Every structure is written in structure tokens, then in C-alpha cells.
């Protein structure tokens, strides 16, 4: 299940890498890929190596992509040359100086990562296992299968010992403490002898850039590493002939025991094969079960064991949070607590070798531990729990599911409730977290690399620290401050102001007009500025820019009601001047007729009217502008009256040309269509013949028979033409009545069709019109 879920996650991340060009997202996806347990099968099936390799020239993520591809390239040689490395490992181990031990641990951890990804996380289906065995050499197959099932046993044991994704804070922190088990028997031996050192100092081995990300992934998958951390003794309990033998040996006796360990492993290859087949069938049966049933069972087991182990775990977590990495004695106590957890699980007391092995830790490791301790001592002890809680909240949610089901990413994401803090405090706490993580993930020359790494991490934290400030951005629209004017006293004779739509056009001293059209419209009272706009474009924003004085309000009302002004009484001209400026000449003349006092002072207003209506005229001697305007206006009206009379007389004496007449006064009325058809059918149209047609003499009485025929035929042929000129006949309808008056109607003789004059005229006009084009 783990390998299948890893395959699904790799495919999802590969699709996101291809789709998303954002450098931050690309870096995030590459980091997720770097911490996944990638195997050669996954690389071959998904082709994710090519996808990541395409980013090697990217500006932001190019270096990370190159490191990741280089890390994946090491998978294949490590798997093929595993036996040779197993043989040469002990020799190189014995030759190295004591200060090179951390680098040796780094190589061991890298070998474990690669071999565990290749074997422990293989798919459970037989097809995948057969593909894997084809790629591996024949000598490696039993070793890989045996080691894969040791890993599975440890994983099952870790699920039973610790509740799935235990919510205790130590479970997430132990992910840092734990380094994964080795992939080969002698590596397992060396790692078991070094396990107290790992318990004493978190992450003594300092991984490469890719391994740093694997440690962060271990934080998220705290259950597996807690199980591995607590399951060191469990491995020894499951295989007592190996672990007890290895733990009782001192560290310096590794070379002597290599042959015995390899011999024992070969003797157990057959049994491990059978065990692998049995476990494979159990795993396939588990896969067939619904995932929800498996999750529920694991949750029940975890909850029951959590109740049993809560005292020991609480003690361990308290020790870990109060002074993590401060004193060796407290670390020995926490290791004893872990051993008590293992003893509850297995029923055996195997906690003795760990303290014994702790006494044999090399001095250089203790010195390095002192360096790490000085880094952690700089932080205040009170802020450490807060920082770690913040780390847990940021890195992952409180885990509630098992290891495999959490890897499948199929559970609904719960929204985290974060306390909104100021950006300064958030950056401060994240800075503390940064120092904590850096102090636990550097090797011997960490003192030189810390400043550079802190700079890189601060660059990443800047956008994260700026995020809490984003929701606080509120659009600051500056609202106009209303003037602090006291309200006037309420009067009994109160009349409300007119609608607010009209206010904007009546603001006094408005000089800046956008166009002459608006300037002209502003001169008329009671009109909106956009009165010609017929299309609705939103409600007009009409409001008072400032409170108008009582005088301004009165003048505005008077301007809007000039036609209602008659006698003004004793109101002086200076008060009425703004109103009189808006008056037309007729309105001004009417107001002056009602108030003769104003005539003496309105001469300037009449001057404006004279310049507008009579631009070229000048007043005569001793003539006021008012008198001039009235004189010129009277002269204009007289000229207009004279012109009107001349035009009327000219039209009256004009000879009448074409006159409109009624259509059928002196001619035959056109009968309706159905009546005309019946007349033609039955020959009953004689009554409609007018008197004019009868004026022609009938040629029947005199002359030979030849003459009447000719006369009748000529009259027959001439009558239609005459009729055409006499009236607006539009068809040959009344040809039958004409013929019936002279000659009896012959139904066998077809009537001659003639196009009506109006229709002929229309057709001619159409022809002329279209022929011109």
C-alpha cells in the first residue's frame, strides 16, 4: 500500500509540475518529491526523472532539480553493487578516524534510504515483486526479501505500540531524533550500536540537501519514525539471536563479528522466504478489505494501547519538552521511558543494553552534541514549547489516521484555526523555529554554514510572514467631511427644498463647464445637465456639496419660479439682481411693469439683451438701453407683420396650377372586383355607362352592312382610348358595357387587357431607376 500510494502521489506531483509554472509551487512540489520513498520501479513507470530534469536550467528551482536528479541516479548503482558495498563497508569503517563517524553515519543513512525505498516500500502485488526480482542480482534477492519483511514487522509493531499519529508532541519531535534502520546486516549492527547516540543527540548525521527534506518528511510521518525509534528494541526482541548478540558486543568489536552475522543471516534465508510468502498473502488479504475497516481497526488498537502507555509517554514528552538536548542524564531517562514502552509491547525487559551502550559513546560525538546544545541554549526555555506547537500547526494537522492511509492523501482536509498574530510576532516565532531546525540538522562544520542557511530560510519566510497582513488591507476611501454647521431653528412656515436632482445645476459661481452644450444648458433653470441622455446609465449622483445659506436657497427658489414673480414690494434691486439676471426680456419687462421702481436700475440688464439680440445697433442720443431694446423690438415686429401680410397676399393671388380632384366625378366609377367579374360574366354592365359615351351617333340605321361593321369596329377600338383619357380606368372592366351599348356582348370574344396608367407609370419609373445603375 505504501508503494502504491507513493506512486499515486508521484503521479499527482508530476502532473502539477507540468501544469503549474509558478516557481514557489514548483519548489514546493520538488520538495515533496524529494521526501517521498522513490524506487526504481516508480521512476521507470512514471518517468518523473525526465520531468524533474527538464527544470535543471530553471532560474529558481534549477539547483534543487539537479540535486534531486543526482540523488535519484544513485538508486540504481546502490542496488546493484549492494553486496560489494556490504563487504567493503566494515573495512572502511575500521579505517576511518573517530571524527569521521558522522560522515559514516550519513552514508549509512543514505544507503538505508535508498535500499528501504527499493525493498521496504515495494508494491504488494506479485507482478511488481517479479519485476523487482528481475532487476536485482540473484545473490541479493533473499537478502532484500528478508529485510523487507523485517521492515514490515517493525511497521506493524510501531502501529501497535504507538497510537496512529499520536497527538503527543513527542511523536512529531521523535521524527527528528530517529534515523532510519540500516539496509544490510552489518549496517543494522552498526546502527544498533549507535542507537544510543541517536537517542542522545537528534540528527547527529548531517544529510545532504535532499536528506534535509527527508527529515521534514519524517516530521509529517511521525508514526513510522516513532515506531522505528521505539522499535529498535523490538527488532532485537523479534530476532533475539541477532539483536541480543549485537547489543552486548562493544563498538570496537565490529570487524570480528561480521562473519558470524553473515553466517546467521544465510542460515535464516529460507525461513525468511517462507515468512515473506505468508506476510504477502496477509497483506493482499488486507488490501482486499475496505480501507475504512482497516483504519477503524488500527484506530481501535491505537486507542487501547494509548490508554495503557499514556503515563510513560507523558513522562517522556515532559522530559523532552522541558529540556530537549540539554543534559545527558535527562536523555538517559527518556531512553529508559522508551525502553519501558518496548517492554510493554513485547513482554520482555530489554532496556539494559541501551544505557550500557550509551556509556561507550565516542568523545567526538559528545563534543558535537555540546555544540548543538549551546545553539539550543540560546533560546529561552519558555518559548520552546510555543515554538514546537507552532511548528506542529504549520507542518501538519493533528494526525488521526494510520501511516499508509495518511500517505494516500484521501482524507478530507480540515481547516486549521490559526490565531491571528501580528507579523512581527509571527516572524519572531518562525525565526526561533528556524534556529531550532537548523541547529538540529547541521554536521561538524555547522557553525560555518548556519549564517548562509539562515539567510536562505529568511527569504522563504518573507512571503509567509506577509500573508497574515493581507486580510487587514481595507480599502481606505476618503469620505468628504461634512462641515460642522449648526442646524437652523425650525420655522412654522416650512417648505421643503425641491428634489436633489436639480441641485447640481444650480450651484452658484460654476465656471468650469466640460462643453459649450453643457454651458448652454446650465443657463436654463430646472434642467438636468444630462437631460439629452436618453440611455439609462445609473442613477445620477445628486447631493449638496455644502450646506446652502438661507439667502442662496431663496434665490434658487426664485430663479426656478420667475414666471410667478409679480410685485416684489420694497425688496431692493441688489437682492433681486441674481434673479433678474436670469430673466428673459419678456419676463424682465413684465416684472418692471409691475414694479416701476426697478426701471431705473435695470439698464445694465437691458444692455446685455441688446448686445445679444441686436449686436450691430447702438443707442441714439439720450436713449437708454431699455428704450433702445423696446424700439428695435417694435421695429422687428412691424417688419415681421409686413412680411406675413405680403406672403399671404402672394399666395392668395397666385394662379392655381394642378388641382386635386375627386377620382370619379366625371367618369365611370370603378366597381368592386367581384362585381366587375359578375358583370363580365353575365353582361350586366350597361347600366353603368355614363352619358358622355352616348353622345356618339349609332351607325346602324344608315349605310350598307359593311359600313356598320366598320363603324362599329372603329368605335369599338376608339372607345377605349377615349375612356383612357377621360377617367382613371385601370382595367378593361368597362369595355364590356361600352360594347354592349353598341353591339351585343359576345362572350366568345376575349376582352383586350390594358395596363393601368398608374401601374404603367410605376413600372416605367422602376425601369429608369434600375437602368441608371
UniProtKB/Swiss-Prot annotation:
Signal peptide residue numbers: none
Region (Activation domain): 521-680
Chain intervals with Basic residues compositional bias: 239-248
Xref: InterPro entries: Elongin-A_domain, F-box_dom, RNA_pol_II_trans_fac_SIII_A, TFIIS/CRSP70_N_sub, TFIIS/LEDGF_dom_sf, TFIIS_N
Entries under SMART domains matching the protein: TFS2N
Ranges of compositional bias, category Basic and acidic residues: 79-93, 136-156, 249-265, 271-304, 317-339, 368-380
GO MF, one annotated term: double-stranded DNA binding
Start and end residues of each stretch annotated as BC-box: 549-558
Main location: nucleus
Superkingdom as given in the UniProt entry: Eukaryota
Compositionally biased spans, kind Polar residues: 112-124, 728-744
Region (Disordered): 79-480, 671-747
Modified residues annotated as N6-acetyllysine in this record: 430
SUPFAM superfamilies the UniProt entry points to: Conserved domain common to transcription factors TFIIS, elongin A, CRSP70
General function of this protein: SIII, also known as elongin, is a general transcription elongation factor that increases the RNA polymerase II transcription elongation past template-encoded arresting sites. Subunit A is transcriptionally active and its transcription activity is strongly enhanced by binding to the dimeric complex of the SIII regulatory subunits B and C (elongin BC complex).
Extent of Low complexity compositional bias: 162-174, 704-718
Protein name: Elongin-A
Residue ranges of every copy of the F-box domain listed in the record: 565-609
Residues with the Phosphoserine modification: 195, 310, 380, 383, 515
Keywords annotated in UniProt: Acetylation, Nucleus, Phosphoprotein, Transcription, Transcription regulation
